[in-house]
């Protein structure tokens, strides 16, 4: 484990709802992100895992979280380029691939 970050709600309470662990060698290819959360509601859609850039504008989807835990490959150089904010969002089944704006929890990797 290279880094671990708590995933907390975005409201004022900042309740810890899960963790994200960066696996693999720091700065190397082949890193993975392991997500482990409490059960949560996806509403009528699904939960998607994102890496958001520190500029708050750019982001990349890592995939869909089915259940409460999963491991996702991290794109090469994503962390070095500032994609260190882990975000879980509720998404709808629609034809829009971008982030819905409905974040459930978030944490920033200390890398």
Where are these regions (language model features)?
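N-terminal targeting/export leaders
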Residues: 1-111
